[in-house]
Amino acid sequence: MRVVHLSDLHYGPRHLEEADRCFSAAVDRAIELAVDVAVISGDATDHALDLHAPAALRLLAQVRRLADHCPVLMLQGTWSHEPPGTLSVFRMLGSRHRVFVADRICQVALMGSASPRDLSVTDAAAADLWLASEGPRFAEVPPGARAVFTCIPSINKAAVAAAVGATAAAEAQGEQLAQLLQGYAGIQGLARAAGVPTLAVSHGTVFGCVTEHGVPMAGFDHEFTTGALFSTGAQATLLGHIHRHQAWTQGEGERRQCIAYAGSIGRFHHGEQRDKGFLLWEFGPDGVDCRLEPTPARRTLDIVFEGRPDMDQLREAVRAQELAGVSVRVRWTVADEDRHEVDRGAIERALSGAADVQLEGRIVPMVRTRAPGISQFVSLADKVRAWATATDVHAPPLLECLERVTTTEPEDIVAEALAPQADEVSGSDA
């Protein structure tokens, strides 16, 4: 059995061209590979979309095209990206194969013995190939099941906090999910003994995973650990949420288990590392395996200056690169007093051949040192001594000037400042 695993499509106005180009290419490739079933593991949209919005129409068209080829399972992703109910419209597509929307914790079986590519367009059996459990899991493997999917949608952390308290929510979430996942081991074992492929689908963060920008995720509020996910007994765990493809495995042959993020379908931000694409999962007598199928994600280029942008270096970088179709980000770091010396217009003109240009300047604020306890001193001389100590300045000349300012009349100070110096007078006489 072949399963195509797509994730984090993020359809919305901001990323529409990138998302649609990459997802369309992925659907084309999935049809070419003759996959048996497709899984979208969350965040199909970037935020709530109006049904008449171009992003919604394009997403519906692509999912319909995919569902005309094979059954499709769509999982509820992050609530801020896919508010509850966002995916409900996909149940009504009327495609050749029904789209199953997993918006609750459940198990669902892919039914039927025939491969979708062997069914005729008029075959009624193709219209409804999904059987969902009434509760969180099946009591037994449904007869005729071709595969069993364990669906764990994105967790509403606010609900967890309301139940156990905000301070305990982070650890309680992980503990409750770990217990839930362990409870699936029994039914997964029965399915595997019957030769039925077992898959888990979820959306969240695995402790120790790495983001698309190369940052390890090692906090205490992450949903999963690899141990908890392996404890389900599923052969394959299809994950969404992290935009970088990565995988963990254990066991060999028929006992092999694999956990994998597909990563985002496209490159939505600057600095994202590695290829973008989707996963092709293959189940056979030798176990399960997956591989990344790349999509035509956009190319990005970062040009970084430690100080003010050097236009000569920038032009040299432009000559060394083919900028057509490339998204360029220029970053620099300058002191607060030099911020107005950066010519943004000149930078944009130098990069006019790029698909788009993003300018990011980091301003280093001026830091004024304040002597600790200076406000507690009564005399101005004591305050000057404290400041000189804090700033490592030689104090006696400052104190001499202070003495003159406080003990001499202003007219005398001005007259002395305007009077010619002794050496100047002697020089003129010579």
For the regions a language model picked out, list residue spans one by one:
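Active-site environment of divalent metal-dependent phosphoester hydrolases
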Residues: 12-13, 46-49, 75-86, 108-111, ...
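Divalent metal-coordination and catalytic microenvironments
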Residues: 8, 23, 38, 43, ...
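Conserved beta-sheet core of the metallophosphoesterase superfamily
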Residues: 91-98, 206-285
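Binuclear metal-dependent phosphoesterase catalytic core
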Residues: 106-145, 257-329
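Conserved catalytic scaffold of divalent metal-dependent phosphoesterases
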Residues: 92-222, 262
